[in-house]
Structure formats: C-alpha cells, structure tokens
C-alpha cells in the first residue's frame, strides 16, 4: 500500500474518531487478523474481539476533558497517530496522557496497532 493511500486512510480514521464514529473506522480499516496492544501491554487478537474491549473501556469513561489529535506521520507501511487524552474512568481514576498509536498496514488494512505513552 502506498504511503499516500495510508495517509488518506489515517486522516479518515482521525476524522471518524473525533466525530464519535470509531466503530465505522474499525469496520473499514482494520484487518480480520488485527492484533491490538494497548497501554497496559495486553494483546487482543482478532477483529471481533477488539471492539468489545474498546466498548468496555468507553463504557467506563465518566468524564472527558480532552480528546484531541496532535499529529500523524506515515512512513512506508507504518502510520503513527498522536493523541492527547484526559478523561476519568470508573474504578480506575484519571487518565491524562499523550499517546502514540503505531499501526502496521497489510492489504490496505491495519494488521497491528500498538499504543505507547
């Protein structure tokens, strides 16, 4: 997949996420064999399993103060999306962090997604 196409896809993912349509991004851009590794280091594999984990976290958020896109970069078949987040999670507390989402692309879809802070 060409860098220009990945860049276009990343821009669409960011727009969907910021407009509350993250599920649409999952349907369109994530590979069936996706592996997601979140900030806690836990690996979740398979497209059907990742959204349920995401919904669990999203359902526990009690307040959002900041959710903003801080930048993106594409190099080869890898994209980097930087997010600034500040929100409260039930039974966890405040999560305030700048995180980098690193995505590897295969066949026009994200095959691996890792988060670092």
Name each model-derived stretch.
Residues 1-29:
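Short, low-complexity N-terminal intrinsically disordered segments enriched in polar/charged residues
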Residues 4, 23-77:
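A solvent-exposed, acidic/Ser-Thr-rich amphipathic alpha-helical stretch
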Residues 30, 85-87, 101, 117:
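Short beta-strand segments enriched in hydrophobic/aromatic residues
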Residues 31, 90, 105-107:
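Short, acidic, Ser/Thr-enriched surface-loop or helix-capping motifs
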Residues 60-62, 86-96:
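Short, cysteine-centered beta-strand-loop-beta hairpins and adjacent loop/turn segments enriched
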Residues 65-68, 82, 94-101:
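Short, surface-exposed coil-to-beta transition loops
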Residues 72-78, 104-109:
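A short, structured loop/turn motif at beta-sheet edges
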Residues 98-117:
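Short beta-strand edge/turn micro-motifs at domain boundaries
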């Amino acid at each position: 997949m060409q860098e220009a196409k990945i860049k276009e896809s990343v821009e669409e993912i960011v727009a969907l996420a910021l407009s509350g349509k993250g599920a649409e991004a999952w349907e369109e851009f994530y590979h069936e064999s996706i592996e997601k590794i979140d900030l806690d280091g836990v690996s979740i594999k398979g497209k059907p399993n990742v959204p349920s984990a995401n919904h669990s976290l999203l359902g526990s958020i009690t307040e959002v103060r900041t959710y903003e896109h801080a930048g993106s970069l594409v190099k080869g078949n890898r994209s980097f999306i930087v997010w600034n987040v500040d929100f409260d999670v039930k039974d966890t507390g405040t999560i305030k962090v700048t995180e980098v989402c690193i995505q590897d692309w295969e066949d026009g879809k994200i095959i691996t997604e890792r988060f670092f802070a």
